[in-house]
């Protein structure tokens, strides 16, 4: 075993690439470390092409092992199970920038597996995994147009920060991941605290500049390894087939792409395609329907792209900057806490907001430890939204990714827990889809949150931009259709308020996207965003003053932290009785914060009254009404507050001499008593005879029903 090692400085971190020791039966394997965060990345590529597929079969699996953080997994089996949402999102983060760099026509199956084996809590493993995937592909010999590199960019105190630590990120106004080659940016994923277009573009450019050191290091590493490239040549173009399909379909296909309604257009194109396949086979030009279909798709692309570059109307007749017709409604579901219907052209989302209590927060077990997520946004894309049948089940990678993007778009305007103590779940149900359903989810989420009475800082809207770039020029498209996304060169999604950007996602399929193109796209996206926000404001301008009648009311009070045990009671008896008898949910924090939630406000008020009674301090010289709970030879014990009894000595019952306590008091009697003393041990001395003075004020009787524990003597 002859290890090959390459180390270099990347911002504040030292990165090491190593190969030649482990997983030698894989096509390539690299251990990447960045300040004790180690990710082992393997690449396996099949030597035989899978010609039965009409897409490149690339699979990326990112997996975190709990041993990396020195922990044993929870659960019955004590081992890692299905990928978490975070692992799925990181798999997509690796996949998106490398997929467009495999050559067209390459159909050999490739699998990238990234395993986190050691984690420094300050260094997130996602950037490390992306670097490792690039390095492994670079030394694999598989046809690949890389290497790529990745960088995380923060923005603090007006300055960009390269690869901020997990401790620095909470103070950053930006969390942006950018990936690209030496010459081009390929992917951007970001969340921002309402930043300007200039700051966002600057972050992308800064990250691309800083990552050049990684690209250079990977090139040197690959040269040291010296793997021979695969002997692969792209499939030759069948010029006769290309010409025949153009002859048979150009005119008719051109007319089909002037049909504005998606379903009708697809039906027309499908009929043309079937006829062309039959005619081409009959003519003896090609007998493989799959190859005919691929060339037919190429003709579709040339027709649509050519029209756009020549300045002709788009598929649905719009000009490049025009937004599809908008329709907005709120409060569409009577029992939901907040709901909205957002429609943009043939893309539509029903979005529903639900308010819950602290116990409804999502508990997430990560390598860095446990955390509770108080804001959830889930995106569902059922097959009927595109007029198809299909399997229904757990969310797929795409749904998880789109949900996270929509969440990023809205997160910056969400109130803090102190401002709004509710846990919030938003669900976006896509009911129609023809491009940019994730951005429809952003718009619908903003509307539903306002309808639910969540005090968000501002309305948020999202828009998807596209690009068609040819030798003769380029055109940036606003509010792209599904076909324009599929046939174009860029998917550029921007969410934000009137003041700035909250989320930016960019996926580019070609090299050569310049700063100028990104500037135009951001400027055009701002105009589109402001237009959408104006329409949304006509439906609802500000969060509703009151939450839904069907949402729980949360009341927060503070008690002495030393009294928490009294509210809980022995074995939880007191708090259990409180919740069952009042119909509320009660949550306590170690600092004495108590949150009481109930749909009925009266129930919450009753629970608060009883908690305040339980935690009240006994005041010396104050008169209370209490119930006699025990008799003794030397006096009587009287309960004056929940869980708090005091002793009325036999000499303090009356002015007359008392021989037998039972002659004057019986169990259950309600009497007025005055507090004479509370000693250091918390024992309370009471007097009935001194309480009978007519000038003294009487405290309310204790809520005896709240007492679940026998009082201590």
Curated annotation (Swiss-Prot):
Q: Which cofactor does it need?
A: Mg(2+)
Coiled coil (UniProt feature): none
GO MF term (any one): magnesium ion binding
Q: Where is the KH domain?
A: 552-611
- For this chain's UniProt record, which GO biological process terms are given? mRNA catabolic process; RNA processing
Q: How does it assemble?
A: Component of the RNA degradosome, which is a multiprotein complex involved in RNA processing and mRNA degradation.
Give all residue intervals belonging to the S1 motif domain: 621-689
Q: What is this protein called?
A: Polyribonucleotide nucleotidyltransferase
Record-annotated residues binding Mg(2+)?
A: 485, 491
User: Keywords in UniProt for this one?
Assistant: Cytoplasm, Magnesium, Metal-binding, Nucleotidyltransferase, RNA-binding, Transferase
EC? 2.7.7.8
Entry's family note: Belongs to the polyribonucleotide nucleotidyltransferase family.
Catalytic function, reaction form: RNA(n+1) + phosphate = RNA(n) + a ribonucleoside 5'-diphosphate
Functional summary from the UniProt entry: Involved in mRNA degradation. Catalyzes the phosphorolysis of single-stranded polyribonucleotides processively in the 3'- to 5'-direction.
Say if the entry is tagged with keyword Cell cycle. Answer: no
- SMART domains from the xrefs? KH, S1
Species the sequence originates in: Aeromonas salmonicida (strain A449)
């Amino acid at each position: 075993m002859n290890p090959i090692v390459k180390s270099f400085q990347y911002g504040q971190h030292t990165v090491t690439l190593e190969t030649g020791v482990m997983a030698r039966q894989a096509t390539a394997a690299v251990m990447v470390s960045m300040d004790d965060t180690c990710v082992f990345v393997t690449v396996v590529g099949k030597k035989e092409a899978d010609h039965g597929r009409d897409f490149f079969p690339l699979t990326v699996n990112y997996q975190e092992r709990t041993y990396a953080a020195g922990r044993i997994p929870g659960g019955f089996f004590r081992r890692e199970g299905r990928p978490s949402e975070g692992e799925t999102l990181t798999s997509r983060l690796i996949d998106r920038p490398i997929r467009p760099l495999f050559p067209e026509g390459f159909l050999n199956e490739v699998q990238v597996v990234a395993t986190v084996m050691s984690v420094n809590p300050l260094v997130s493993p996602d950037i490390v995994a992306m670097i490792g995937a690039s390095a492994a592909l670079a030394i694999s010999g598989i046809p690949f147009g890389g290497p790529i590199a990745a960088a995380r960019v923060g923005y603090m105190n007006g300055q960009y920060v390269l690869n901020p630590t997990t401790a620095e990120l909470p103070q950053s106004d930006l969390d942006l991941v950018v990936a690209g080659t030496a010459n081009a940016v390929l992917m951007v994923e970001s969340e921002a605290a309402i930043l300007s277009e200039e700051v966002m573009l600057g972050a992308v450019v800064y990250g691309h500049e800083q990552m050049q050191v990684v690209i250079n290091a990977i090139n040197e590493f690959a040269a040291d390894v010296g793997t021979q490239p695969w002997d692969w040549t792209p499939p030759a173009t069948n010029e006769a087939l290309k010409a025949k399909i153009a002859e048979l379909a150009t005119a008719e296909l051109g007319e089909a792409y002037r049909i504005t309604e998606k379903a009708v257009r697809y039906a027309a194109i499908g009929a043309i395609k079937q006829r062309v396949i039959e005619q081409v086979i009959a003519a003896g030009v090609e007998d493989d329907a799959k190859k005919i279909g691929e060339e037919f798709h190429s003709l579709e692309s040339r027709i649509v792209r050519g029209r756009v570059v020549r300045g002709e109307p788009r598929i649905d007749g719009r000009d490049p900057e025009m937004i599809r017709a908008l329709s907005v409604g709120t409060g569409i579901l009577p029992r939901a806490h907040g709901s909205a219907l957002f429609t943009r052209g043939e893309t539509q989302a029903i979005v529903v907001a639900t308010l819950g209590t602290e116990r409804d927060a999502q508990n997430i077990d990560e390598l860095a430890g446990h955390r509770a997520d108080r804001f959830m946004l889930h995106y569902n894309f059922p097959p009927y939204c595109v007029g198809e049948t299909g399997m229904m089940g757990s969310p797929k990678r795409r749904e998880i990714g789109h949900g996270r993007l929509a969440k990023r778009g809205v997160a910056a305007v969400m109130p803090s827990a102190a401002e709004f103590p509710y846990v919030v779940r938003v669900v976006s149900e896509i009911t129609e889809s023809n491009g940019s359903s994730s951005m429809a989810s952003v718009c619908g989420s903003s509307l539903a949150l306002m309808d639910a009475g969540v005090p968000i800082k501002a309305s948020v809207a999202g828009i998807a931009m596209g690009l068609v770039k040819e030798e003769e020029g380029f055109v940036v498209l606003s509010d792209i259709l599904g076909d324009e996304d599929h046939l174009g060169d860029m998917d550029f999604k921007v969410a934000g308020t009137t003041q700035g950007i909250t989320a930016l996602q960019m996926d580019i399929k070609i090299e050569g996207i310049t700063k100028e193109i990104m500037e135009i796209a951001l400027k055009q996206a701002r105009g589109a965003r402001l237009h959408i926000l104006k329409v949304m404001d006509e439906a609802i301008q500000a969060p509703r003053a009151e939450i839904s009648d069907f949402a729980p009311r949360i009341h927060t009070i503070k008690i002495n932290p030393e009294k928490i045990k009294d509210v809980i009671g022995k074995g939880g008896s007191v708090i259990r009785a409180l919740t069952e008898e009042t119909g509320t949910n009660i949550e306590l924090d170690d600092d004495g914060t108590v949150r009481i939630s109930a749909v009925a406000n009266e129930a919450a008020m009753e629970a608060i009254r009883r908690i305040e009674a339980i935690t009240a301090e006994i005041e010396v010289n104050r008169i209370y009404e209490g119930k006699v709970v025990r008799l003794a030879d030397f006096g009587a014990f009287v309960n004056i507050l929940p869980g708090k009894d005091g002793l009325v000595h036999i000499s303090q019952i009356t002015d007359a001499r008392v021989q037998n306590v039972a002659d004057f008091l019986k169990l259950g009697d309600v009497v007025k008593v005055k507090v004479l003393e509370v000693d250091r041990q918390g024992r309370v001395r009471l007097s009935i005879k001194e309480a009978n003075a007519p000038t003294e004020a009487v405290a309310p009787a204790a809520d005896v029903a709240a007492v679940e524990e026998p009082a201590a003597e």
